[in-house]
UniProtKB/Swiss-Prot annotation:
Crosslinked positions (Glycyl lysine isopeptide (Lys-Gly) (interchain with G-Cter in SUMO)): 14, 402
Name of protein: Steroid hormone receptor ERR1
Species, as recorded: Mus musculus (Mouse)
Keywords: Acetylation, Cytoplasm, DNA-binding, Isopeptide bond, Metal-binding, Nucleus, Phosphoprotein, Receptor, Transcription, Transcription regulation, Ubl conjugation, Zinc, Zinc-finger
Cross-referenced Gene3D superfamilies: Erythroid Transcription Factor GATA-1, subunit A (3.30.50.10), Retinoid X Receptor (1.10.565.10)
GO biological process, one term: positive regulation of transcription by RNA polymerase II
Amino acid sequence: MSSQVVGIEPLYIKAEPASPDSPKGSSETETEPPVTLASGPAPARCLPGHKEEEDGEGAGSGEQGSGKLVLSSLPKRLCLVCGDVASGYHYGVASCEACKAFFKRTIQGSIEYSCPASNECEITKRRRKACQACRFTKCLRVGMLKEGVRLDRVRGGRQKYKRRPEVDPLPFPGPFPAGPLAVAGGPRKTAPVNALVSHLLVVEPEKLYAMPDPASPDGHLPAVATLCDLFDREIVVTISWAKSIPGFSSLSLSDQMSVLQSVWMEVLVLGVAQRSLPLQDELAFAEDLVLDEEGARAAGLGDLGAALLQLVRRLQALRLEREEYVLLKALALANSDSVHIEDAEAVEQLREALHEALLEYEAGRAGPGGGAERRRAGRLLLTLPLLRQTAGKVLAHFYGVKLEGKVPMHKLFLEMLEAMMD
């Protein structure tokens, strides 16, 4: 089991009720209600280099036309683990009742499996019981979240999400010893990465998938519904991620909520921008949902595509590295301006520790002398106002969608939207 960060107070996320048409009767099923998907996702294509899942359950890329959403070859709502018909989203991905129950039993029982072969067994509907080790490995590979499983075995009620990474707690505040780590992006020198940066790299959430449905009707409403569902799942992951940041869990529970409610969209928007860095004039909302500016407009996002691309181009010009991204993301969290924060000094202490970690990383990257690290850190920090401005536009747009009442939204997403617009 993962070790606990000192001071963690659990946040509770209530699961959505089960879909009335969910498949029943599997010998492996349990009765825990699934977190259901909002209806009508939009067609889209995958990120370059994204491999299709075996058994045809991954999203294939189609031919891209100018400003159009491109249909994926994904069959309607299949389980990403075994390819059976999915009953909804369970623990972060589309999955069937059997794989949902298997994953739940494995986590609750802390069961360890071993593969009798070479850890490369094919997992299909017919063969999913043949190798439990490879089945569980595939559950994790497609993105099932361990923190989505209640560990008390009590059915129903409120669902407790613990932090994902199984890492030792990092003391806060304190010194951040440096160690060498190769910097991504070419033949640059190695940069010393302090313990905080290393920790942030470890706790960075795994990929989420939008799972757009190519059988959904034309129009922008299905696409907006897909994004609302994606954002709802990302909020759950963001809460878990924030809890793993040293210093955040030492805040009072009310201050944790105030911080999250004020900056969650900035964290999500920065994630979209980071996924889009390898692309040219396209936005990667998820691994399997990539739109250009015209495609975003066709999907009902109005001018948001242009606003998001402006942020992406700013970060592309800076050649943002992954270490810098995880620091910038944590700084965006700590950069809350909520008037409801009770202990502003504690939040400021967290912000200063992250700022120092950024300066230390840039100092190792730039080498001694010249103050280049401070200039680089300053340029990165100057992207935060644009990030906040862009997130504000996204919030305003989806709050307008909420007021129209034409697109179903999950309870958590609604609550976070309303908290921001109050």
